[in-house]
Amino acid sequence: MFEVNPVKFKIKELAERTQLLRGIFDYDAKNERLEEVTRELESSEVWNDPERAQALGKERASLEAVVKTIDDMDSGLEDVEGLLELAIEEEDEDTFNETSKELDYLESRLADLEFRRMFSGPQDASNCYLDIQSGSGGTEAQDWANMVLRMYLRWGEAHGFSPELMEVTDGDVAGIKGATIKFTGEYAFGWLRTETGVHRLVRKSPFDSSGRRHTSFCSVFVYPEIDDDITIDINPSDLRIDTYRASGAGGQHVNKTESAIRITHLPTNTVVQCQNDRSQHKNKDAAMKQLKAKLFELEMLKQNADKQAAEDAKSDIGWGSQIRSYVLDDARIKDLRTGVETRNTQAVLDGDLDKFIEASLKSGL
C-alpha cells in the first residue's frame, strides 16, 4: 500500500503557496489588465503604431507568465486531488505514481513563479548590456577576459536571451581587452545584475613556458537598457566620437568594416563602443542608446548608499571587489559573496552559471 498522507500534505502546501503568490502578484489586477491588453492587441488599429504593439505584446507575455501559472496551479491541484482519490479507491499504484509525478511538475512551475518574485527592481524586466574588461596581466588576463566572454555568450544562448556582441577589442597576442554583449529578453537585467564585479582566475598559464600559476582579473559591469520614455540629458559638447575599423576576435561575430563607433562621455569618462553593423549611422545610434543606459545605471548606483563600490567595480580590477574565484588547478569555482561553490569548472566556463546567479539573487544581493 502506498503512503497517502505525504501526498495530501504536499497538495495542501502547494495550494497555500499558490494562494500566497496570488496576493503577492496581485492576481486579480493582472488578470484584468491581461484582458485589456489582449483586447487591444486584437484590434487592427494597434498595428498602426508598431512600437506600441510591441510593448503591449511584451506586457502580455509578462502578465500571462503570472496569470497562467496560477490558473494552471489551481486546475492542476484539483486534477491531482481527483487522481489521488481514484488511486485510493482502486488501490492503483500506477495512478498513485502518476499523482506524484504531476505534483512534482506543479511544484517546479510554482518554484519558477516564486523565483520571479526576486525580480522586483524597476529595471529588472529590461534587456541589458554586459561589459567585460580585462585586468592587468597582459596576454594571460586578456585570454581570461575572452573565456569570460564565451561563458556569458553560452549562458545567454542557453537561456534564450539572444546574446549580441556589440563590440570586442582584440588582445595584443591572444584573447580580448574588452567586449560588450547585449542580452534581449524578459528579465535579462534581473538575471544578470548580480554578476557585476571582478572575476578572478588562478591557473597554470598556457602562455608561461615554466608552467607557473598565474592570477588574472577581469571585471564585469551589467546595466539595463532603458525605455525611450526615460529622459537622459546629454550635452553634445561632452562627447568625443571616434570612428575606427572593427577587428573583433572570432570574426563570425563582428563585421570588419570602417563603421565602428566609440563614444566617450568626457565628464564621467564613460566609454561605449559599437561595431556590429555595417552602417556607421546605425552603430552610432546603438552606441548612444548604450551610453544613455550606462549613464542611467551609474546614476542609479550613486543614489544608493551601498552602490559606490559597485560603480568602482567597473574600473577597479583587483582584489577588493571580487565576486567569484575560478581556481582551475584545484577544480574549484567559488562565489565569495554567497559561499556557493562547484568542482565542475568546465560546465561553468561553458555557461552553467545558474547555481551562482540564483544563490546571489535569493540572498538579496
From Swiss-Prot:
Keywords: Cytoplasm, Methylation, Protein biosynthesis. SUPFAM superfamilies: Release factor (SSF75620). Peptide chain release factor 2 directs the termination of translation in response to the peptide chain termination codons UGA and UAA. One of its GO terms (molecular function) is translation release factor activity, codon specific. This is Peptide chain release factor 2. PANTHER family: CLASS I PEPTIDE CHAIN RELEASE FACTOR, PEPTIDE CHAIN RELEASE FACTOR 2. GO terms for cellular component: cytoplasm. It is found in: Cytoplasm. The modification N5-methylglutamine is found at residue 252. The gene is prfB. Its main location: cytoplasm. Methylated by PrmC. Methylation increases the termination efficiency of RF2. Belongs to the prokaryotic/mitochondrial release factor family.
